Amino acid sequence: MAHKKAGGSSRNGRDSAGRRLGVKLYGGQLAVAGNIIVRQRGTTWWPGQNVGMGRDHTLFALTDGHVTFKKGLKGRTYISVLPANLEAAE
């Protein structure tokens, strides 16, 4: 009776490449319309003002401006893009 399992090379030895998820633009950074802000699985972050959500929950900028992160209801974090001309008025 063998005391070691033979090889196993055909069963093991596979792994998938990383999916490159995460935040791509951080708070205060300038976003151009269409820029991806976050790639995620599920809704870790939620879209706020001037931010859209794709089929795969990717958040992207709808207008040019600066990225902001804010805590909201139910402990959700909302990502918004504040237009540059609106920030100058504040």
From Swiss-Prot:
What keywords are annotated for this sequence in UniProt? Ribonucleoprotein, Ribosomal protein
Q: Does the keyword Ribonucleoprotein apply?
A: yes
Q: Name one GO molecular function term.
A: structural constituent of ribosome
Provide the GO biological process annotations. translation
Q: Is Metal-binding one of the keywords UniProt gives this record? A: no
SUPFAM superfamilies noted in UniProt: Ribosomal L27 protein-like
Domain of life (superkingdom):
Bacteria
Quote the cellular component terms of the Gene Ontology held in the record. cytosolic large ribosomal subunit
Give the matching InterPro entries.
Ribosomal_bL27, Ribosomal_bL27_CS
Q: Which NCBIfam families match?
A: L27 (TIGR00062)
Alphabetical list of PANTHER family matching this protein: LARGE RIBOSOMAL SUBUNIT PROTEIN BL27M (PTHR15893:SF0), RIBOSOMAL PROTEIN L27 (PTHR15893)
Family, according to the entry, reads as follows:
Belongs to the bacterial ribosomal protein bL27 family.
Question: What is the protein name for this chain?
Answer: Large ribosomal subunit protein bL27
Instruction: Please tell me the species this chain comes from.
Output: Paracoccus denitrificans (strain Pd 1222)
Question: Which gene is annotated as encoding this protein in its UniProt record?
Answer: rpmA
